[in-house]
A protein has these predicted regions:
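Interface amphipathic segments
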Residues: 1-519
């Protein structure tokens, strides 16, 4: 008997009948010449097989496979037209497939050389179900039981005979999958109840691809159970195009459009509507108790962050309802970013503020720009940390605040403007220069009223200079005027503070300090 492929086997007519049984200890590595993936399976498996058939039809009413590492497979199977290639018909029933934690580790180590952490956290796997259909269209139904919960599957696997690529369509559902255990983040995530339909699920370019439609009935996150989350769209190349929505007792969210954060330069083109979202009740914030937020958002931009953003974000009809503290309303805030005359430019426009930032900027390195500039003049006071990023900022900024109602209510900043305020200047790391100039004509901070506030910081020559002056309204109604001047050079800091009042009985004072730093 010469065997090279199934067609090489003797041709059997329907009149040929056969039966038999096999009890043996087998080593799957011996089949590695035919199935290379079995090359690591050196442990013996106990096989118990009973079969019978006629012609090209084979029945296996008994199929049992076990080992000494917590693996057991028990079921039955049938094959029709077993030499028909992709047109072979298969029926299989697994009454019990069980793998202990040790069995999972042995199986995955032999298959891939390593065990994915997510499988290590399953503790065990039990499966019972059926597989039926032609090899090119095979339906798989059954129940998976694991240490993280139960999953029900009803999926058809289709194989393209030309490319031999596999696609999967069907439904996957669970009522109690412990996502926190799977992700090893049990403090953040809890159980999820979902029923999802997939169409054409496959892998292309290292990413899964599928049409997805379904409902997540409940999802525990941050000790809160979200409800009624709907998905309807296409997941492809690491991105999603479709609709995501949530209709929870503590807020509703609907997102339409597409986004892809897996690209080298992520892109977003979507619209979002948020209604009566309660961040405190959702455990998203320890602030905003008894408050709700509603807004509409339109985003059409590319970029990983504000540093390389190119496009537009528009926030409309922001409504904060806070019965205890009063609410606020913002009709629109628009952020646009891109290239203007060969330079990056970021613009913010709204009824309460405008801002323009132009040049080469990186927001997360701005603190490093300040520290490294000041460190030139007081090196013994400021130490540059090894992990501090190297800044290359060279930009100008001009910010104007008309009022701070939104900032104070939304971000709970205790600042109130009576007149518009401005902040402008520049950073230039190449020349090791900075200039910051702020004007705050009249404002209240943390309950105290000030006027004529002016701030200057710059290093025009061989020293770093900062000055702050203004007036503070006292409880008696008198105005206390003050100024602070600071000059730093060569580990030497000169500080002068002046103050005085404007009442009938005047008083004032001056405090001067000369500080030297050593290391």
């Amino acid at each position: 008997l010469k065997y090279d492929s199934l067609p090489e086997l003797p041709q059997m007519t329907e009149n040929v009948r056969y039966d038999g049984s096999l009890k043996a200890s087998v080593i799957l590595k011996d089949l590695a010449p035919f199935v290379p993936a079995l090359s690591r399976f050196e442990e013996p498996l106990d096989l118990n097989l009973v079969f019978s058939g006629h012609g090209k039809h084979l029945d296996c009413p008994t199929l049992r496979l076990t080992n000494h590492h917590g693996l057991m497979i028990a079921g039955e199977a049938a094959l029709s037209n077993w030499d028909a290639g992709m047109d072979m018909y298969i029926y299989g029933k697994l009454g019990n497939l069980t793998m202990t934690k040790e069995g999972i580790n042995v199986l995955m180590t032999n298959l891939t050389g390593k065990v994915p952490p997510i499988l290590q956290r399953l503790d065990y796997i039990r499966f019972n179900g059926e597989a039926a259909g032609y090899l090119h269209d095979l339906t798989l139904t059954g129940l998976f039981y694991t240490g993280a919960g139960m999953v029900k599957t009803d999926v058809m696997m289709s194989i393209d005979e030309q490319s031999m690529s596999r696609t999967y369509s069907g439904s996957v559902a669970s009522a109690d999958l412990d996502l926190g255990k799977l992700l090893n983040q049990e403090k953040k995530f809890g159980k999820v109840d979902f029923n999802v339909e997939l169409k054409g699920f496959n892998y292309k370019n290292r990413y899964p691809e599928s049409y997805i439609k379904g409902i997540i009935s409940s999802f525990e996150y941050s000790q809160y159970q979200y409800e009624n989350i709907m998905l309807d769209g296409v997941y492809k190349d690491g991105g999603f195009n479709g609709r995501l929505s949530m209709d929870d007792a503590n807020g509703s969210v609907q997102i339409d459009g597409n986004f892809n954060v897996a690209k080298t330069i992520p892109d977003f083109n979507l619209k979002a509507s948020v209604k009566n979202l309660r961040p405190h009740d959702l455990h998203l914030s320890d602030k905003y108790e008894n408050a709700s937020i509603s807004l509409d958002l339109t985003a059409d931009f590319t970029g990983k962050s504000i540093d390389d953003m190119n496009g537009r974000i528009s926030l409309d009809s922001l409504q904060l309802n806070a019965p205890d503290e009063g609410g606020c309303f913002l009709d629109n805030l628009t952020i646009t970013a891109g290239q203007v005359s060969g330079e990056k430019e970021l613009r913010i426009n709204s009824s309460f503020m405008t801002a323009v930032i132009r040049g080469d900027y990186s927001y997360h390195t701005i603190p490093a720009s300040v520290v490294k500039t000041v460190q030139r003049y007081i090196p013994s006071l400021l130490t540059i940390k090894d992990n501090m990023p190297e800044p290359h900022n060279n930009f100008q900024f001009d910010i104007c605040l008309e009022n701070t109602e939104v900032l104070s209510k939304l971000f709970q900043i205790p600042l109130e403007l009576y007149l518009p305020a401005s902040l402008k200047g520049y950073f230039n790391d190449g020349e090791e220069k900075l200039h910051v100039e702020g004007h705050f004509p009249e404002f209240r901070y943390n309950g105290t009223r000030y006027d004529s506030g002016v701030l200057f910081c710059e290093n025009p020559s061989d020293r770093f200079k900062c000055s702050l002056r203004g007036g503070m309204l006292m409880k008696s109604g008198a105005m206390l005027n003050f100024s602070v001047e600071a000059n730093a050079k060569n580990d030497h800091l000169e500080t002068t503070i002046n103050w005085g009042n404007n009442t009938d009985v005047t008083y004032g004072g001056k405090f001067a300090a000369d500080t030297r730093f050593f290391k």
